[in-house]
From Swiss-Prot:
This is ANK repeat-containing protein nipk-1. Belongs to the iASPP family. ANK repeats lie at residues 375-405, 417-446, 452-482, 486-527, 532-561. Expressed in the nervous system. GO terms for biological process: positive regulation of cell differentiation; regulation of transcription by RNA polymerase II. Acts downstream of the receptor complex composed of ilcr-1 and ilcr-2, which is a signaling complex that modulates neuronal activity and animal behavior in response to sensory neuron input. Mediates signaling of the complex. Gene3D superfamilies: Ankyrin repeat-containing domain. Residues 92-167, 212-255, 280-333 are annotated as: Disordered. The keyword Repeat applies. The lineage of its organism: Eukaryota, Metazoa, Ecdysozoa, Nematoda, Chromadorea. SMART domains: ANK (SM00248). Changing D247G: Defective aggregation behavior. Keywords: ANK repeat, Coiled coil, Repeat. It comes from Caenorhabditis elegans. Residues 212-223, 239-255, 315-333 have a biased composition (Polar residues).
């Protein structure tokens, strides 16, 4: 069969030339590249997000907790952890209510579509008002639920709790001894919640002790780790005790975790895990180790709030420490108006004398113990002898501030005659300096080796220096019954020198008040002179002083005075014997009779030594 050629032009299909598949893949691979800068930025961004400071982390926690509170509608019904914990759990009824509300809204929208648009503006206005009323009602319901409570980190104010005390109003006083527990409480139950003394017995079974804590767990009413809550203890009568779930509605109670339903919602679990593991030692080099003093592993506890939590556990009660054997407790010697001896001395010194004194003290205090004169007097002895108040005050203050506690008291340094600066101040009759030195811890028992070996108390009592004797007797370590070289106590010196003339003031000495002060301070009236054996009654009879004898009868015990009236001296004479053996004259006969009668009425036996 012959082939017929087609009429007209003939189109022939040809394939378009293209690159090979291998070349295409190569081009695509060349376009791929690793962006190192972007990866480094993302890494830095991740580190900056996770390497936060403690303060930033706490802010993040507060923001998250506030968001959680708004989301879960955490309400503060009361300071009870059960209700607060119940608010964090899901409410099945609220879910059903939300679903029903959504279904109702869908139905209303469908009806509106069927009915078409509103006919006039009045219907639109009524519809808007109805929606506004519904929104207001929802807001009112939310307000009734209570204030939103942020669940951020809480720093409790921890205070040391006192020990068990039957009448516990406040902390046990410092140094108070432990109290014996009371087993029989029947005698204390008749006054309800209080007693006559105005305090409440915290161990009474009629009261339940609770403490409103910042913690929201129900089992943290009282802390047993040595700390108490910052809130005061709550006392409620036994009859009014209620279950911890009594104030919670049935709907709230159903949301409390039970043994059957003991799992938290997943969202809450994720939040808690993220909340607690966000900032740990492994994730950041700035992480802190757990607190060493609170017993918990949270990094935001105890020492993270230095102004609210203690650094170390505090004890509840402690007794006073025992001082070292060579230390003297320096207590200010205050007067009736509360002014110390230092203040009184400083008040009478002119400012110019103080300035001069401190300038001199700065150049003298280092060699105050070694720089002595021929009599062994130190610079303090010399200024005390001259009664230079400015230099005395300045040198004593400088020595007090530079004195080492373990060293001997520099104010008790004596010269070659055993005289201390205090003894020199007594000789100068400077009561302000004496009180000031006693306040600094100077000893009042030093004795001079001159004359008869008087102590400061002997010298003051023998010369009727009432204020000086009162200041010396106020010192605890004063030895009232110490004798001088003549064997006389301070009381014997006071009786012997009564009515005599003072060599410096040329005034008659009246020692009645000093005798009374000495006896009240513990002076023994039965001590006789070691050289003559005479007692205070012997000296009163020798002086022919009826008034003094009557005064001794009033300040001395009656039995003691009878004993003194019958005591004999080293010559074997009693007080009555002295009246009979002494030279008689008309001027003294009347006085002798009065003394004799008073001794007989006091129990004295006549002629006892010659019987």
């Amino acid at each position: 069969m012959a082939t017929v050629a087609p009429k007209g032009n003939c189109l022939v299909a040809r394939a378009i030339p293209s690159d090979s598949h291998a070349d295409q893949l190569t081009d695509l691979l060349c376009k791929l590249s690793v962006n190192g800068d972007a990866n480094q930025k993302s890494v830095n961004k991740f580190e900056s997000q996770h390497g936060v400071t403690p303060s930033d982390f706490r802010d993040i926690q507060n923001i998250r907790s506030s968001a959680l509170a708004k989301k879960t509608k955490t309400s503060k019904f009361q300071l009870d952890g059960v209700t607060l914990f119940a608010d964090l759990t899901p409410n099945s009824k609220s879910k059903k209510k939300t679903e029903n509300q959504e279904t109702k809204e869908k139905d209303e929208e469908a009806e509106e579509k069927k009915d078409g648009p509103p006919k006039d503006d009045k219907e639109l206005k009524m519809k808007k008002e109805k929606e506004q009323e519904d929104e207001n009602a929802e807001l009112d319901e939310q307000k009734k639920d209570g204030d939103l409570l942020g669940r951020g980190p809480v720093h409790n104010v921890r205070v040391a709790t006192g020990g068990s005390h039957p009448y516990h109003r406040a902390q046990i006083p410092y140094g108070c001894a432990a109290q014996t527990p009371i087993t029989d409480i029947s005698a204390y139950t008749g006054y309800g919640s209080g007693y006559e003394c105005g305090s409440t017995w915290s161990l009474s079974p009629d009261t339940t002790i609770g403490s409103i804590s910042a913690s929201t767990t129900p089992d943290t009413v009282l802390s047993s780790d040595g700390y108490g809550s910052a809130s005061p203890p709550q006392h409620s009568p036994k009859e009014s005790l209620q279950s911890p779930f009594s104030d919670i509605s049935s709907a709230d109670t159903s949301r409390v975790l039970t043994p059957e339903n003991n799992e938290l919602p997943e969202s809450l679990q994720d939040f808690i895990l993220q909340y607690s593991n966000q900032y740990t030692k492994e994730e950041s080099i700035r992480g802190r180790p757990p607190s060493a003093d609170s017993g918990v592993s949270s990094p935001m506890s105890a020492r993270s709030a230095p102004y609210a939590s203690p650094h170390v556990p505090q004890g509840t009660c402690s007794g006073p420490t025992t001082p070292s054997f060579n230390q003297t407790r320096l207590s200010p010697r205050t007067s009736e108006n509360g002014i110390t001896a230092k203040q009184r001395l400083n008040a009478i010194i002119p400012e110019s004398d103080l300035a001069t004194g401190f300038h001199w003290a700065c150049t003298t205090w280092k060699n105050v113990l070694t720089n002595r004169d021929a009599d062994g007097d130190t610079p303090l002895h010399i200024v005390a002898a001259h009664n230079d108040l400015g230099k005395i005050y300045a040198l004593c203050e400088t020595l007090r501030k530079t004195m080492n506690e373990n060293d001997d008291n520099v104010f008790n340094v004596s010269n070659n005659f055993g005289e201390t600066p205090l003894y020199v101040a007594v000789l100068q009759r400077s009561i302000e300096v004496v009180e000031y030195l006693l306040e600094l811890g100077a000893s009042p028992n030093s004795r001079s080796s001159r004359a008869v070996g008087d102590s400061p108390l002997h010298f003051a009592t023998a010369r009727g220096m009432n204020n000086m004797v009162e200041a010396l007797l106020s010192k605890r370590e004063i030895r009232v019954n110490e004798t001088n070289d003549d064997g006389q106590t301070s009381l014997l010196c006071a009786v012997k020198m009564h009515g005599m003339m003072d060599e410096q003031t040329q005034h008659k000495i009246d020692n009645k008040s000093i005798i009374e002060m000495l006896i009240k301070a513990g002076a023994d009236p039965t001590i006789a002179e070691t050289s003559t054996g005479k007692t205070i009654v012997h000296h009163a009879v020798d002086k022919m002083d009826v008034e003094l004898l009557d005064f001794l009868k009033t300040v001395v015990n009656e039995d003691t005075f009878t004993e003194l009236a019958n005591l004999s001296d080293f010559h074997g004479d009693t007080a009555v014997d002295l009246l009979c053996s002494s030279t008689q004259n008309e001027d003294t006969n009347n006085v002798r009779e009065n003394l004799y009668i008073r001794l007989l009425t006091s129990g004295a036996v006549p002629n006892k030594s010659r019987a």
